[in-house]
Amino acid sequence: MLLLQKEHIIQIATMQKNDAVVIIPTYNEKENIEAILRAVTGLEEHGFDVLVIDDGSPDGTAAIVKQLMAGDLKDRVHLVERQGKLGLGTAYIAGFKWALEHDYEYVFEMDADFSHDPKDLPRLYNACAVEGYDLAIGSRYISGVNVVNWPMGRVLMSYFASKYVRCVTGIPVNDTTAGFKCYKRRVLEAIDFDKIRFKGYAFQIELKFTAYKLGFRIKEVPVIFVNRQLGVSKMSGGIFGEALFGVMRLRWAALTGQIKPKQA
């Protein structure tokens, strides 16, 4: 299939059924969850499934997901419920293991609050499925600064945090803290999740750095990040602190040869 856009012909892959799954961690996302699930599963040219990892949301997020699973989103949406807030990193690791067990070839990370535009999912998929990259990153900083409705202080903190990570680790990625990604199956199969150190913001850095050190090909795909309109942000100062000091540990791990492929 060919798509004509901005005077360039772009090849778009046609996915096989059950080829890709989008992992969406949730905690108190009742305002967003139905809309985001319908937006992802409603992409006409691509059959993305969705896995929601809910950390015991007291607002009833999981109940909404179950209602949709019992209705018209049956077989497209899946749910893993956990007891309490166990951290973003452990949520994604649980999702990765589930995706591998269910034989998906492409596995995505995505926020529930529309900060990541579902319409960009095919572009990330295309980078891996057609162009041959192993990890595609929805990047806010590959072509300038593409962030909407963030306070300037937060924009600067995020931007320079990514620069700091790149400087310390040497990873050739502009948006090192991005949370909108597509992994090929083989990347996740090569990572030893038992040795992943971080649970919060630094988890996003660690997964990219690990993939890079294991020799996988990475592409940044420019996206526009839009701050959430509904619900409450889960970011905190502690999360940034983990990222700040965590990159030094990652650098040391690389220097001492601790980052190795998972043993079969």
What are these regions (language model features)?
Residues 2-18, 170, 194-264:
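Hydrophobic helical membrane-anchoring modules
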Residues 29-42:
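Short, well-formed alpha-helical segments that are part of the catalytic scaffolds
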Residues 47-57, 80-81, 110:
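Short beta-strand/loop segment that forms part of the nucleotide-sugar
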Residues 82-101, 106, 118-201, 228-245:
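Acceptor/aglycone-binding surface of glycosyltransferases and processive sugar-polymer synthases
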Residues 43-46, 69-76, 103:
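Short helix-capping segments at alpha-helix termini
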Residues 29-32, 57, 117:
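Donor nucleotide-sugar binding loop of glycosyltransferases
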Residues 54-63, 114:
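A conserved acidic beta->alpha catalytic loop
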